[in-house]
Amino acid sequence: MHHKVNVKTQREVHFPMDLLQACGASAPRPVARVSRATDLDRRYRCVLSLPEERARSVGCKWSSTRAALRRGLEELGSREFRRRLRLADDCWRAICAAVCTGRKFPSFSVTDRPARARLAKVYRMGRRLLVGVVCRGESVVSDLKQECADLRRVIFEGSTRIPSSSLWGLVGVLGWTSPERAMQLTFIGRALPYGSPDVERRALASHAATLSIPAECHPNYLVAAEQFAKSWADDNLPRKFRIYPIAVQESSCMEYSRAQGGLLQSFRKGFVGYDPAAPSADPDDLELAKERGFSRIRASWYSTFRYRGELKSTNQSLEARVAVVPERGFKARIVTTHSASRVTFGHQFRRYLLQGIRRHPALVDVIGGDHRRAVETMDGDFGLLRPDGRLLSADLTSASDRIPHDLVKAILRGIFSDPDRRPPGTSLADVFDLVLGPYHLHYPDGSEVTVRQGILMGLPTTWPLLCLIHLFWVELSDWAPARPNHSRGFVLGESFRICGDDLIAWWRPERIALYNQIAVDCGAQFSAGKHLESKTWGIFTEKVFTVKPVKMKVRVRSEPSLKGYVFSRSSAFSCRMGGKGITGIRAARLYTIGAMPRWSRRIRDVYPGSLEHRTASQRYGEPVTVYRFGRWSSAIPLRWAVRAPTRTVGNPVQSLPDWFTVGPAASSVAADSNAFGAVSRVLRRMFPGLPRKLASAGIPPYLPRVFGGGGLVKSTGLTTKIGAVASRRWMSRIGHDLYRSRERKSTLGRVWTLSTSPAYAASLHEVEKFMDRPDIILTRKCRNPMLKHARELGLFEEVFESRVGGGILWASLNGKALVESHSPSILQVSRNLRRSLACPSGGFLRPSAPIGKLVQRHTLPRGTVWFLESSATDSARQGGMGLPPPPPPPLGGGGMAGPPPPPFMGLRPESSVPTSVPFTPSMFSERLAALESLFGRPPPS
């Protein structure tokens, strides 16, 4: 179809940001901003009523689109028609967000024939989306999501030029045929609207069908899993179970819904008479309060919530409700709601397991939240990856729902068979009961299912156990046949990183195949089209990167090696950079050709084999090709840009306005991906008028949130000068906080948090009182205050945050709301910021100071906190006379004295649970035969 365009009045058309305009309708009038529903209602009533010649901004056949919409309105009714219209509009906004990331916003000259052809494709794409969703339903959205997955698969397969017809022709319209630019379009799939009711129903049906099917693992896997867990616990977990502060949430539980107060209301009803210590209390009092709280939690498992709550039967503690949570990406997540006591007690196990998980090199950066550093350090100490390896980006479907119970029990048995690693008064059967149940699930449609496989997403222990099981699969994949990857015989590095069910690994093809086999044997199912292998591209937790080949010279030196069961030979090498001479020699490290999992290498103690001593010799080879980390993709996530987030991090309940949430979301994405230019362009197009709204309320829109500003992003990023985004009054207060206050931190950012959480505000006030006490000393990091009775409490940030977080329970039990019942107004936040700007001692900042340097100073460690013991303070108060201090308060106060709690009701005794058998030399032949039967071949030697 040829478009008739009046070139005298219209010479250029920009990419349409409005879906109806993309179908050829007239552009929306510049009226005052209204709500989303009202705006859509006005738009579609306008375009349906106007004559064709008036409802057209450029030459386009609008009449057929309007007729299809009218038919859809008559067939569906007004309510369903509007829902589908909003669904299509959200899909188009996801496409527009990806388009806005480009350096130049696309426009089409109507005097150029190729440009008119590209514009016609835009109109066809908009009509396909709008009319398809309204008339055919949600299958069009699923097709768009599959197109994004197919485009990513094409990029990972190594294509150097992407076909122009990809993603409904959008690649050709924009001219983004390079893999780097086309990668941004694949993030449209994760930014699609929330899952619809049909998506939720399908997710619930799949969840019930999966959990109701019993599954078992091969016995050889169970033996290996228990040995792995026991070795991992011995190497990483503390010898004794630790007690942690009670986690406070307003999430729903079996006793109380979220509207009724949730888990916090259960604390108030169950902890009657419990008086926790205030955040300003002495360190010893806080430790005693934690022990008292843990005792109440342990007692609540069998008494408090079963008899004082709404659950009347002891068996009902294994009851759980199923809830569906729609997510962006047109999908839905299934979660479960459990009794408050089990959730609270499970958090103790979760934090104990995380103490050991964070010590593993593949998980330490992930637990710390630095996923980019986790990937960048994959190439190890040498910066080398074997040349015959491939990047595996694993993606599992319903990973936690498909894990067999016997495999989970083997892992738990290996970890908690030692009584010292369990909470006082608990048995191994109690651990099984807490983690696995078996739980009886109640679905929203009234159906009921007893769980026969899988670990539920509503329990705190699920994610740590998923990490351990995934780590077990990875370690077991070391059984794959190893081979030299060079004629000289040396073996370079392999590496991997884990985050729950996400895996990124650089492995030889044999190990990838064995990992896939092990995971499938243990019940896993890989996502079709998302479980990717590539020689160049990798993706880990939605962060895309590349690796690059590098040629290096390698020196090989033979070493004495262990012969026998597994180890046949090993090599050590050091590398020299080529080019203009030698730039450095790296330290040598042994790499084994025949590899075993680390947890199995203890076999050397019982089967030492024989050592063959040789005279070390050195050989130099030609430069070989190895791989290193390349660079991060410039693509950014788009979920935050489609619609303003309604919640902030750490505040999962309260609904907040866009001026409150867009700034932190944009700053987080820009800082994580170092793409300040792309984020600023998306902000300017997707949220027009937001900077003006913040500035009119007296809030600097482009000042970081830690300094009290709106948190929006400029294209200059961290190099932006403070004088360009803040007035002298703001710079004076920020300079005082950073350079003249005791904390050396800006306190303006707390105003935003205090406006949403009264409990946080009360806890923060108590901690500030504690830090101002005369017996609290702040020194530089690793410095001693040179006082005899000073006790180190830790770094300032750790002490401050732990006391504030632990004090939220104290504030909540004393009547403070965890979150405000209403959203804060912009005028309220503005007034609080103006009051906080008062600075009695003044301050100074150069207007040319970069924002990045100021943020860096704000995040610097502030030193070590020391506490003067009571003997020192009493001696000081009494003039140095050295009188004895008053006696300490008796232990067990607060009504906690009494006999120990009875054993848990309805649980099996510990003696009935099989325990792990220690590995002995007599078991060697049986173990070898079992492994041969499992893999169909003898282990590599």
From Swiss-Prot:
Coiled coil: none annotated. Residues 905-918 have a biased composition (Low complexity). It comes from the Viruses. Its main location: host cell. InterPro entries: DNA/RNA_pol_sf. It is an enzyme of class 2 (transferase). GO terms for cellular component: host cell cytoplasm; ribonucleoprotein complex. Residues 875-918 are annotated as: Disordered. Its EC number is 2.7.7.48. GO terms for molecular function: RNA binding; RNA-directed RNA polymerase activity. It catalyses: RNA(n) + a ribonucleoside 5'-triphosphate = RNA(n+1) + diphosphate. Yeast strains also contain a double-stranded RNA (dsRNA) called T. The (+)-strand of T is identical to the single-stranded 23S RNA. The T dsRNA seems to be a by-product of the viral RNA replication cycle. This is RNA-directed RNA polymerase. It comes from Saccharomyces 23S RNA narnavirus (ScNV-23S).
